């Protein structure tokens, strides 16, 4: 689920607002064009936009998912971690019988991905602490998204921005897991199994591999694989990916996704066109994203207690947390008191002038 081009190219695209076609290899998309259809954004919206108390309101969801004008937090790895395999669950390829990599090497790559995403998940939990003061009241300066959020590399100070950024990066990776791995798909039954047609596990979401709250080694099925990726992504593989399962052979990155329902149609990659592989990958990514959002809420409760976590979740989901979530900070209460006092003073002055005139 990522744009397969250099980070410098991505920066130029954003600056120019001209989304030129990307290189032939692409992941679940973050842009519109070149075969991509903002797949990450639409998956995230399908997973987390709903009318309930624990769902994200429009402006907040736009910051997390993107809105067509920017990547959003979930697209950030395609801007700053485009060449980091662990951020996209790449390079965990393996095939039984005379393969150039061992099962242990593939499992190590999966583990590296999980540990990377655990780090992002834990950072989101950590940054949520900055949403509230020591009394559990919302700090308005930390929760408003006016003007958008700056990239983490530019020192964005607001707790809501940074918590959403870290969680979005974790979501990017778990969504990529379904697009880039054999977890949810199946091989083409009309062709022999091999590096160009690896076996699929056809398993549902959520995946036991993606235990982001855990600390132990993930349980990796013996036939699980993700694709080897190089810039010249092809079948058969070239360079370090020669004789290996490649991203080009295994990905189910592109197609149309309904941002409201998650319905997936018109798959755009060879593996995605096999059976219902693209739809399975999208469904898996939607289900997993919802699961990780529940996991984040549970992690906040474990870390901060039920009362503080409840206010944190409200602050992370609502567009106007000081008004909607209660528990205003001392600064907000003082400002409200001052405004009320001024109002009473004006009323009193008007009444006094009226009596004097009489």
Model-derived features: positions:
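Bacterial N-terminal signal peptides that target proteins for export
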Residues: 1-9
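C-terminal segment of classical bacterial N-terminal signal peptides
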Residues: 16-24
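N-terminal, motif-rich segments that launch catalysis or mediate targeting to/interaction with membranes
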Residues: 24-168, 176, 180-326
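Catalytic PLP-binding core of fold-type I/II PLP enzymes
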Residues: 172
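Juxtamembrane/start-of-transmembrane alpha-helix segments at the extracytoplasmic/lumenal side
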Residues: 327-339
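C-terminal membrane-anchoring or membrane-association module
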Residues: 343-358
């Amino acid at each position: 689920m990522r744009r397969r081009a250099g980070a410098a190219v991505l920066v130029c695209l954003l600056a120019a607002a001209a989304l030129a076609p990307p290189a032939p290899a692409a992941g679940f998309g973050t842009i519109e064009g070149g075969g991509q259809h903002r797949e990450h954004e639409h998956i995230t919206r399908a997973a987390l936009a709903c009318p309930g108390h624990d769902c994200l309101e429009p402006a907040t969801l736009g910051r997390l998912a993107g809105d067509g004008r920017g990547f959003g937090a979930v697209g950030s790895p395609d801007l700053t971690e485009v060449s980091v395999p662990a951020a996209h669950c790449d390079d965990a390829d393996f095939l039984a019988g005379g393969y150039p990599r061992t099962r242990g090497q593939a499992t190590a790559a999966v583990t590296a991905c999980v540990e990377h995403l655990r780090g992002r998940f834990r950072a989101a939990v950590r940054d949520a602490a900055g949403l509230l003061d020591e009394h559990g009241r919302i700090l308005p300066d930390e929760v408003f998204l006016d003007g958008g959020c700056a990239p983490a590399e530019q020192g964005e100070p607001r707790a809501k921005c940074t918590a959403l950024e870290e969680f979005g990066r974790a979501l990017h990776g778990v969504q990529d897991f379904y697009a880039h791995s054999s977890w949810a798909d199946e091989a083409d039954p009309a062709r022999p199994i091999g590096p160009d047609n690896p076996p699929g596990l056809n398993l549902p979401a959520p995946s036991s591999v993606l235990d982001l709250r855990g600390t132990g080694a993930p349980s990796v099925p013996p036939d699980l694989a993700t694709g080897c990726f190089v810039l010249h992504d092809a079948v058969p593989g070239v360079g370090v990916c020669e004789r290996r399962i490649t991203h080009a052979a295994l990905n189910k990155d592109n197609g149309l996704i309904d941002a409201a329902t998650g319905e997936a149609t018109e798959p755009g990659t060879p593996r995605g066109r096999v059976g219902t592989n693209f739809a399975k990958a999208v469904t898996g990514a939607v289900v997993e994203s919802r699961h990780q959002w529940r996991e984040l809420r549970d992690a906040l409760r474990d870390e901060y207690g039920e009362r503080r976590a409840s206010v944190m979740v409200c602050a992370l989901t609502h567009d106007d947390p000081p008004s909607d979530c209660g528990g205003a900070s001392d600064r907000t209460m003082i400002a409200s008191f001052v405004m009320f006092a001024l109002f009473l003073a004006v009323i009193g002055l008007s009444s006094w002038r009226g009596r004097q005139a009489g």
